[in-house]
Amino acid sequence: MFQPAPKRCFTIESLVAKDSPLPASRSEDPIRPAALSYANSSPINPFLNGFHSAAAAAAGRGVYSNPDLVFAEAVSHPPNPAVPVHPVPPPHALAAHPLPSSHSPHPLFASQQRDPSTFYPWLIHRYRYLGHRFQGNDTSPESFLLHNALARKPKRIRTAFSPSQLLRLEHAFEKNHYVVGAERKQLAHSLSLTETQVKVWFQNRRTKFKRQKLEEEGSDSQQKKKGTHHINRWRIATKQASPEEIDVTSDD
């Protein structure tokens, strides 16, 4: 059994690698993590032994105060020749030389960045039904995303008719529910409207007329049913027969 290393107090001076007064007996023994001392006492793991030897050599040369140099040299020695380990540059070198924007860390991520349909699985399903609205030879999903807002059919603007125009249109509708051809053209010219505006107004007016007619017929039938129901209840209460049940016979 090996004795555990005594606890050491890490001060700010030791962390920032400033010179601090040390006893003469410990001047040649630099402060290092306890894991390195454990690795030195156990010859089972060759990787830890190699790491410890590299750190000890760096400490003997007096460069242990620079963590970047110790880290680079310790990693640059591969423990196993069959598995090469590339030296890792210090963090400030990585920050000074960032990766280019076009470089992708993995080909899978690059394919997802180039193809927006992978992020929107519903895109292809909608694109099959809306592809006929595009113009040109570009029928890619990117074109769908760019031109989808422009490819929508614009909403029809409702025409604000003046009271005099509405009065003339109502008179024309009372005469004829369908105005076509030269009559519609003449009516539109007299009202300073287009033929399309007159056509749409007559379509809406016919729809309104049919709805009003159905509502009137429905209300009349309900009134008749209510009246018949009250008459039948009165006959049942007074025990009077209906006109169909009365048999009129003459004495002759």
Swiss-Prot record:
Transmembrane segments: none annotated. The keyword Lipid metabolism does not apply. Residues 224-233 have a biased composition (Basic residues). GO terms for molecular function: DNA-binding transcription factor activity, RNA polymerase II-specific; RNA polymerase II cis-regulatory region sequence-specific DNA binding; sequence-specific double-stranded DNA binding. The keyword DNA-binding applies. Pfam families: Homeodomain. Transcription factor, which in cooperation with EMX1, acts to generate the boundary between the roof and archipallium in the developing brain. May function in combination with OTX1/2 to specify cell fates in the developing central nervous system. In the inner ear, it controls the distribution of GPR156 at hair cell boundaries, and regulates the organization of stereociliary bundles in opposite orientations across the line of polarity reversal (LPR). Belongs to the EMX homeobox family. Interacts with translation initiation factor EIF4E. This is Homeobox protein EMX2. It comes from Homo sapiens (Human).
